[in-house]
Amino acid sequence: MDGPTRGHGLRKKRRSRSQRDRERRSRAGLGTGAAGGIGAGRTRAPSLASSSGSDKEDNGKPPSSAPSRPRPPRRKRRESTSAEEDIIDGFAMTSFVTFEALEKDVAVKPQERAEKRQTPLTKKKREALTNGLSFHSKKSRLSHSHHYSSDRENDRNLCQHLGKRKKMPKGLRQLKPGQNSCRDSDSESASGESKGFQRSSSRERLSDSSAPSSLGTGYFCDSDSDQEEKASDASSEKLFNTVLVNKDPELGVGALPEHNQDAGPIVPKISGLERSQEKSQDCCKEPVFEPVVLKDPHPQLPQLPSQAQAEPQLQIPSPGPDLVPRTEAPPQFPPPSTQPAQGPPEAQLQPAPLPQVQQRPPRPQSPSHLLQQTLPPVQSHPSSQSLSQPLSAYNSSSLSLNSLSSRSSTPAKTQPAPPHISHHPSASPFPLSLPNHSPLHSFTPTLQPPAHSHHPNMFAPPTALPPPPPLTSGSLQVPGHPAGSTYSEQDILRQELNTRFLASQSADRGASLGPPPYLRTEFHQHQHQHQHTHQHTHQHTFTPFPHAIPPTAIMPTPAPPMFDKYPTKVDPFYRHSLFHSYPPAVSGIPPMIPPTGPFGSLQGAFQPKTSNPIDVAARPGTVPHTLLQKDPRLTDPFRPMLRKPGKWCAMHVHIAWQIYHHQQKVKKQMQSDPHKLDFGLKPEFLSRPPGPSLFGAIHHPHDLARPSTLFSAAGAAHPTGTPFGPPPHHSNFLNPAAHLEPFNRPSTFTGLAAVGGNAFGGLGNPSVTPNSVFGHKDSPSVQNFSNPHEPWNRLHRTPPSFPTPPPWLKPGELERSASAAAHDRDRDVDKRDSSVSKDDKERESVEKRHPSHPSPAPPVPVSALGHNRSSTDPTTRGHLNTEAREKDKPKEKERDHSGSRKDLTTEEHKAKESHLPERDGHSHEGRAAGEEPKQLSRVPSPYVRTPGVDSTRPNSTSSREAEPRKGEPAYENPKKNAEVKVKEERKEDHDLPTEAPQAHRTSEAPPPSSSASASVHPGPLASMPMTVGVTGIHAMNSIGSLDRTRMVTPFMGLSPIPGGERFPYPSFHWDPMRDPLRDPYRDLDMHRRDPLGRDFLLRNDPLHRLSTPRLYEADRSFRDREPHDYSHHHHHHHHPLAVDPRREHERGGHLDERERLHVLREDYEHPRLHPVHPASLDGHLPHPSLLTPGLPSMHYPRISPTAGHQNGLLNKTPPTAALSAPPPLISTLGGRPGSPRRTTPLSAEIRERPPSHTLKDIEAR
């Protein structure tokens, strides 16, 4: 039996290990340990992942010899790869959080060190041998059966050497006893061997068994095994296999193989959960289970074979032997005496295992469901049979470990964590996982014999979750399985594991969070804070090591406070990396107030600590003393643990802190510089989610500068945007942000140096830095992976920078220009429409503040261009006002009709579009009807201003709106005709006063749809990538063209004509992001030459210098090229406006005057409007992502772009928050953010519309 068992166990364990090794090789690029191991591992890796048992069955016992060969290389991997990988990883080694822990391990005999690296594995295996899937579990169990009574570290050595030798024969058997091997698996998972595999597996299995892996990882986070995110998952895989094995001794033998057959899927799934359960239970149950397995395994193994025969028949022969060796291996109690003594426990175990065996064969049937099935059987049997005792016995520790496990798994293992938490009450899939996990942590030293007594019952459910054993793998398993036989080693191991716990927490948190390895360091910092937050949750996790003997009593009560302190103290270090900006982001001002002490700031926020990063690192060491006052040895490991992660993190953070401290100085200078300050404010807007950030915008940039460094390293990894993490993903919501943000975090990690240096150092822009900190699309992303965006950033940044600061100054100037030019003309309208305009303005603040951005731009052009045109054609303008009003009212009525129909199809899309066109269109209607200059303004804004934009908008408008238009030719055409008439009149104002425009209106009303698409596209599209920009962009253009331009227009410095320019810019915006910048320069010259353009430019120079020139070049070119195109644009504009015929109908009469009033008011309010405008744009969630590519430009013109950024990135999801916060922020930021024109309504409207708008855009197009 031993031979077959060894063959099976070895095979299984070898497979699991070879799988881990294979994964580690893939991850770490390590050469395969051995050809046999590779073969077994590769076969087994797929088989383990897909059907471990089947592979093992297929390979049968022969693989046991083959796996035994690569096994030493795996052990070597564990030794060198684990440590090397850990060191390479940049944070605590897999096994050792600190170099001191590593040195301790190295100080241990090389064997011991290798096994200490395996120790989480070996000890876990011994404590969690019940998991039986771990290689070390088999090794450990063999070692345990032979040397289990002896020192666990000796057992570790034996586990490695003797265990490996015996494991080959006993390996499979011990896989069946994989319940104990669960910890072995955990330990091994923690070890470098499983490290690579588990890193990959943590990603593979993290997704596969997110909840189980979460449990496993969460507990691993607590234990050494979980040090590596990989360890938790690879162990999870094995644990799941083991878990299946753990269910029964018999089941473990037979069901584990069978489980391995189809446990490939289940192994990962149950692995994490079951690992947590089984490891916890195995800590306490292993010996009982193993002895039980010894006695009853044979009887139940036959049953299990009969039940599991269908799947793992080969394994069935070895289950008995496997159980026997395993029983030998786990005996914390003397293997011979404990096994017989545990015969009665096995009797307990057998009833539960038998059902599990019975259930288990079905589980193998459904590998996907195997996890669920296995866990539920584990639940049912553990919950009913073994969970009652273990739960009662482990409930206290389970409660603590529940928090621990749930908190440990909180980062990425929240799912298992709730099951853990509910394990006590609900004993759900992980009922024992936590209780056993707690015992593993808590009872490993003291309660493991009792735990084993419980474990007979608990073994059936030996979801013996030894994720804590990984924590305790070093400290708990040596002391735990020997049941305190080696407390000194236990202390050492505890120190080791404490250090590893931090490492595993940091690494596993990253793993559980699922950040890629490149993010692991970044997440390491961040997750050290985050995990320290979870370490607060995990407090008991640490304490179990200090209180391994009285873990239940001590761990629940003292551990949480101690760990609260310690994680808090350590957290300040890590969190200062992450939260140093995050809490500032939350508190905003406090971090800004103490920006010099990035850690001090946050340390103060998180904990009263010195502002010294190194001090923070030292404090974690000191805090551990307080935390681990009970066990100074543990404190020492914590110190080394903190020392290594602390040193690394502290050094990293310190360097980063120095860097961005220097950057802070630079940023302060930059902040003194309005542009740079604007930039800084904008990042703070990006970090605006923390309200104080708004006020501490300047200071916050410093803090964000730090966070930039820290956030880049830890914050971005931490989605730091934690404030912005979700919104960044919302940024990912669309392409630009999506590709920007996802990499932004990794790039933030890269940006720790690149962005950390660049964002707060190289770029030195608080905006860029906070962007990098918040993984904001612009600077960090741009700098790191968005260098295209970086050019965009610089282009947009630079162009909007000069426009943006003037907009601050220019709101009045623009207003004065508009007032000077349009005031004479608009004063009458203002007086007439004063009340109406105020009402309408209020209404349009909601409605038109969307167009308000275009309106501000058009109002300025209306005033400036209106001066040219109005002075030239005051009669035409008056006529147009009357005629346009008359026609606009019918048009609006018609639009109300057609809009009622079209609104169903196009209203949302149009309402969205019309929100932008509404600005544009309201401006167009009011301006087109009311003012020929507004025609220019309006046409340039959405259509004429940028041929590409116009074509974008016309194409989308004419393409998608042409369909509705043709569907409603009468209504749309009347609208078109009226609008075209007005618009054509305006355009023809210079050429033909009213007759030609009317003719164009009538004759071109339908054509403009196609003509605008065709003629507008040919001209502007030729100059701009509008073919795609029109239709393709308009998919984004409904929100992309519309919102992007609206959003980007302010960013591009088109703020006066945001609505008008907003449409064009999207077409420019995603591709023409650069083009608008280049185009603006080209347009600038042309517009400077162009009187209207120049007047518009002069009036809107600050914001529109870039936007307006290009807008007006497009406008002039468009008008010059195609009067009908202009008309079509107006038609298109009307069509977007047609969405709001009711609004236009309301405004119809007052639209021109009201538009003029709005032009003036928007000139005044546009600065505020623009800040709100981005917020309004944020309402268009799609465009923020579109803005994300445009965000550089948007980002650059910090006023509106900031709002856009914040709304898009930060407040894409919560535009309301952005709207509520950004208006003040933007007003704080820029000269024009002051007015929250139509902030919430617009955002709400646009928010409502953007999805449908995008869909309808796509649909209509």
From Swiss-Prot:
The keyword Transcription regulation applies. Residues 288-471 are annotated as: Important for regulation of lamellipodia formation. It comes from the Eukaryota. It is found in: Nucleus; Cytoplasm, Cytoskeleton; Cell projection, Growth cone. One of its GO terms (cellular component) is growth cone. Residues 800-809 have a biased composition (Pro residues). Residues 1-88, 105-236, 251-486, 505-545, 771-1023, 1121-1148, 1201-1261 are annotated as: Disordered. Residues 105-118, 148-158, 275-298, 812-849, 880-935, 960-993, 1245-1261 have a biased composition (Basic and acidic residues). The keyword Transcription applies. The modification Phosphoserine is found at residues 1200, 1235. One of its GO terms (biological process) is positive regulation of Rac protein signal transduction. Detected in brain cortex in embryo, neonates and adults (at protein level). Detected in embryonic and adult Purkinje cells in the cerebellum. Detected in dorsal thalamus and in dopaminergic neurons in substantia nigra. Belongs to the AUTS2 family. Component of a PRC1-like complex that contains PCGF5, RNF2, CSNK2B, RYBP and AUTS2. Within this complex, interacts directly with PCGF5 and CSNK2B. Interacts with the histone acetyltransferase EP300/p300. Interacts (via Pro-rich region) with PREX1, DOCK1 and ELMO2. The Pro-rich region is important for the interaction with RAC guanine nucleotide exchange factors and the subsequent activation of RAC1, which then promotes lamellipodia formation. This is Autism susceptibility gene 2 protein homolog. The gene is Auts2.
